[in-house]
């Protein structure tokens, strides 16, 4: 059980059997009565944001969640298929629940999957990944103006902006949160 004094951004709580993640919170003391904690929470099953008020000191449940390393196998229609590395069980996850992170997945890649009562909710990618450039325009020789970028398609299919000197076949380091080029490998 968590108390409202434990609330912080990113804390996962359970209310009436539904997992939520606290997006924002504020302690509020009205002129009359006890203090309350105003929260903005994201329902981890639906993705919806909702506001909720708690009395100061109120207790909320701790969700039965676990992070498990899984191997990404393939895409099937609008689902991603993962395999549990210990039980070899396959788990299907709707692609829309990944919040755009599915574009970084390569077949055979091991990533961390967040599960709630055995149901996959989210994937956690490393902060940076090294991916190969499969398609980009050749850079013009002698074009040395600073900060010139061009679009490049990576092996997973996502398109990012890269400096003009990056060529097809180069391996680049990409920030998975911002989708920005970090350097060549």
UniProtKB/Swiss-Prot annotation:
One of its GO terms (molecular function) is translation elongation factor activity. Coiled coil: none annotated. Keywords: Cytoplasm, Elongation factor, Protein biosynthesis. The keyword Metal-binding does not apply. GO terms for cellular component: cytoplasm. It comes from the Bacteria. Pfam families: EFP, EFP_N, Elong-fact-P_C. SMART domains: EFP, Elong-fact-P_C. One of its GO terms (biological process) is peptide biosynthetic process. InterPro entries: Elong-fact-P_C, NA-bd_OB-fold, Rib_uL2_dom2, Transl_elong_fac_P/YeiP, Transl_elong_KOW-like, Transl_elong_P/YeiP_cen, Transl_elong_P/YeiP_CS, Transl_elongation_fac_P. It is found in: Cytoplasm. Pathway: Protein biosynthesis; polypeptide chain elongation. Involved in peptide bond synthesis. Stimulates efficient translation and peptide-bond synthesis on native or reconstituted 70S ribosomes in vitro. Probably functions indirectly by altering the affinity of the ribosome for aminoacyl-tRNA, thus increasing their reactivity as acceptors for peptidyl transferase. HAMAP family: EF_P. Belongs to the elongation factor P family. This is Elongation factor P. It comes from Oleidesulfovibrio alaskensis (strain ATCC BAA-1058 / DSM 17464 / G20) (Desulfovibrio alaskensis). The gene is efp.
């Amino acid at each position: 059980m968590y108390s409202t004094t434990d609330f912080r951004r990113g804390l996962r709580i359970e209310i009436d059997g539904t997992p939520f993640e606290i997006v924002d919170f504020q302690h509020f003391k009205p002129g009359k009565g006890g203090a309350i904690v105003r929260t903005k929470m994201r329902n981890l099953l639906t993705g919806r944001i909702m506001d909720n008020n708690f009395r100061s000191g109120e207790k909320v449940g701790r969700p039965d969640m676990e992070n498990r390393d899984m191997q990404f196998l393939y895409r099937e229609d609008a689902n991603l298929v993962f395999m549990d590395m210990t039980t070899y069980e396959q788990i299907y996850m709707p692609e829309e629940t990944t919040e755009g992170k599915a574009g970084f997945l390569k077949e055979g890649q091991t990533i961390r999957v967040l599960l709630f009562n055995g149901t996959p909710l989210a994937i956690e990618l490393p902060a940076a990944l090294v991916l190969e450039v499969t398609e980009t325009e050749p850079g013009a020789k002698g074009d040395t103006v600073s900060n010139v970028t061009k679009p490049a398609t990576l092996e997973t299919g996502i398109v990012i902006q890269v400096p003009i000197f990056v060529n097809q076949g180069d391996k680049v380091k990409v920030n998975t949160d911002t989708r920005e080029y970090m350097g060549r490998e």
